[in-house]
From Swiss-Prot:
It holds the Pfam family Ribosomal_S13. Residues 99-122 are annotated as: Disordered. PANTHER family: 30S RIBOSOMAL PROTEIN S13/40S RIBOSOMAL PROTEIN S18 (PTHR10871), SMALL RIBOSOMAL SUBUNIT PROTEIN US13M (PTHR10871:SF1). GO terms for cellular component: cytosol; small ribosomal subunit. Belongs to the universal ribosomal protein uS13 family. This is Small ribosomal subunit protein uS13. InterPro entries: Rbsml_uS13_C (IPR027437), Ribosomal_uS13 (IPR001892), Ribosomal_uS13-like_H2TH (IPR010979), Ribosomal_uS13_bac-type (IPR019980), Ribosomal_uS13_CS (IPR018269). GO terms for molecular function: rRNA binding; structural constituent of ribosome; tRNA binding. Located at the top of the head of the 30S subunit, it contacts several helices of the 16S rRNA. In the 70S ribosome it contacts the 23S rRNA (bridge B1a) and protein L5 of the 50S subunit (bridge B1b), connecting the 2 subunits; these bridges are implicated in subunit movement. Contacts the tRNAs in the A and P-sites.
Amino acid sequence: MARIAGVNIPTAKRVVIALTYIHGIGTKFAHEIVEKVGIPTDRRVHQLTDAEVLQIRETIDRDYQVEGDLRRETSMNIKRLMDLGCYRGLRHRRGLPVRGQRTHTNARTRKGPAKAIAGKKK
């Protein structure tokens, strides 16, 4: 198994697909990386030479923000919004949907499991 950006890449998959296992690299960036390094898109990870793996690793370190750094920046951005006290920050703080979705009936994923409320006695 090749280890790139602190992630074990599956060896049986194509390089483009395997790179998407790294947080912060989707299909678009994976294709860009493979083109920059000059590896054919149909090549599998176990067929890569050590030099090619090193080139991929250097390209990712130089040009892309991935894994821990990306997660840290995302959490810092959310924390900044919460410290500002803006609407989006308040929604994050309360654990509600941030992007304008309705909350009357839906949003169970964001709000968590339904809380039981005692019904009205007859």
